[in-house]
UniProtKB/Swiss-Prot annotation:
Active site: 159, 163
GO BP terms: diaminopimelate biosynthetic process; lysine biosynthetic process via diaminopimelate
HAMAP family, alphabetized: DapB (MF_00102)
Compartment list: Cytoplasm
Stored NCBIfam families: dapB (TIGR00036)
Record: residues binding (S)-2,3,4,5-tetrahydrodipicolinate: 160, 169-170
Protein name: 4-hydroxy-tetrahydrodipicolinate reductase
Length: 273
């Protein structure tokens, strides 16, 4: 049973995603905005977090120090960058705070640090917090088991011009879901670039293509192509609120969990399907 009023802290409160996380936290019943963080020296420090997000005055001011707000939150929501997230992870582990991590672009050492911390605190770590994307991942597993052995598999993703990592975390999660269904390791079968004289396509590989343009929120397609037919499974996001709502929902779901590493499939109970 969930406790009432799970208090959340939002990292990167002044960013595009941070503002929508604030809106989502204020809107979800059973969740309370406890703290909002920005980097040291930000012009937004001292601002009211609700007003910053266009949601009205909340009385929660934007701070730069986790120490200053450590008694004001139960779960920390972080969609920033790997180096910052890992610093926040160490703090949360030390102080017994749950985490929802939507940051992408971690190297293997960063991912291992998250796995290690989950021995002591509860963490939801996902490449994408959209309900639709996580349903898509489940569909990809099913499609791969039926068609993966004989089709050419390609993953195409598109995002806005400001995204700093490629392929996207969601595209990689798609590749991992497909590879796992085929009893493969993605690092052994992924092809991330093609140029010049590449020769014919190598059977059994999973190709990736990346687009960065304009203000595209996020579009992902997995293609299973054979001679004579092609299956495409596509997800398109038109608003970051999709991700923000999923992240705050995950924070609420963490209530009462002391430790463990989870993802959105756990939150949505997709593993039972």
């Amino acid at each position: 049973m969930h406790d009432a009023n799970i208090r959340v802290a939002i990292a990167g409160a002044g960013g595009r995603m941070g503002r929508q996380l604030i809106q989502a936290a204020l809107a979800l019943e059973g969740v309370q905005l406890g703290a909002a963080l920005e980097r040291e020296g930000s012009s937004l420090l001292g601002s009211d977090a609700g007003e910053l997000a266009g949601a009205g005055k909340t009385g929660v001011t934007v701070q730069s120090s986790l120490d200053a707000v450590k008694d004001d939150f139960d779960v920390f929501i972080d969609f920033t960058r790997p180096e910052g997230t890992l610093n926040h992870l160490a703090f949360c582990r030390q102080h017994g705070k749950g985490m929802v991590i939507g940051t992408t672009g971690f190297d293997e050492a960063g991912k291992q640090a998250i796995r290690d911390a989950a021995a002591d605190i509860a963490i939801v770590f996902a490449a994408n917090f959209s309900v639709g994307v996580n349903v898509m991942l489940k569909l990809l597993e099913k499609a791969a088991k039926v068609m993966g052995d004989y089709t050419d598999i390609e993953i195409i993703e598109a995002h806005h011009r400001h995204k700093v990592d490629a392929p996207s975390g969601t595209a990689l999660a798609m590749g991992e879901a497909i590879a796992h269904a085929l009893d493969k390791d993605l690092k052994d079968c992924a092809v991330y670039s093609r140029e010049s004289h590449t020769g014919e396509r190598v059977p059994g590989t999973i190709g990736f293509a990346t687009v960065r343009a304009g203000d595209i929120v996020g579009e992902h397609t997995a293609m299973f192509a054979d001679i004579g037919e092609r299956l495409e499974i596509t997800h398109k996001a038109s608003s970051r609120m999709t991700f923000a709502n999923g992240a705050v929902r995950s924070a609420f779901w963490l209530s009462g969990k002391e430790s463990g590493l989870f993802d959105m499939r756990d939150v949505l109970d997709l593993n039972s399907l």
